[in-house]
A protein has these predicted regions:
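C-terminal extensions
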Residues: 1-148
C-alpha cells in the first residue's frame, strides 16, 4: 500500500517541486505567475528572463538561466531535473555542449563531482545512460543544423 502512495506522490510532484531549494525565489515567482510547466519554462527567451529579473529582484539571472536549461534538458532529452542539475554542475549547460561531450568525459566529471561532494551517485546516471543522452543531444543538434 505504501508503494502506491509514494507512486502517487511522485506523480503529483511538479517540475518546480523537483528543483533544489536554492531556486526558492524563482520558484515562488513562477508559481505566482502560473509558469509551473517545464514546457513554458524551456521556451523562455533571454528577453523574458531579463523581464522576470526586472519584476522580481530576488530572482537571479544565473538561476533563471539554469532553470531554463534544466527545463530544456527535460523537454528535449527527457533528463530528470536532478540529473540535469548534475550536468550543469559538470559544466554541461546546453544541448550543444552535451552533444560535443563523450560518455567517458561525462562519467569522469560526474565521478569527480561526487568525490568532491563526498556523495554517491543518487541520480542513477550510468555510462549507458550518458551515452543515450549524448546520442539524443547529437541528433537534436544535427536536426537544428539541417533546418538552417
Amino acid at each position: 500500500m505504501s508503494k502506491w502512495i509514494s507512486l502517487l506522490k511522485m506523480k503529483s510532484k511538479t517540475f518546480l517541486d523537483s528543483l533544489p531549494s536554492n531556486f526558492r525565489n524563482e520558484k515562488s515567482f513562477f508559481i505566482q505567475n502560473n509558469l509551473t510547466d517545464f514546457e513554458k519554462l524551456s521556451n523562455l527567451s533571454d528577453l523574458d528572463i531579463n523581464e522576470i529579473q526586472r519584476k522580481s529582484s530576488l530572482c537571479t539571472l544565473n538561476n533563471l538561466k539554469k532553470i531554463r536549461a534544466i527545463a530544456i534538458f527535460k523537454k528535449e532529452i527527457g533528463i530528470s531535473p536532478p540529473q540535469a542539475y548534475l550536468l550543469l554542475h559538470c559544466g554541461i549547460s546546453s544541448i550543444k555542449s552535451l552533444s560535443l561531450s563523450t560518455p567517458y568525459e561525462l562519467e569522469r566529471k560526474v565521478g569527480r563531482l561526487e568525490w568532491i561532494l563526498r556523495v554517491k551517485n543518487e541520480t542513477g546516471t550510468t555510462f549507458s545512460l550518458l551515452k543515450e543522452w549524448i546520442k539524443k543531444a547529437s541528433q537534436i543538434d544535427k536536426s537544428i543544423w539541417n533546418l538552417g
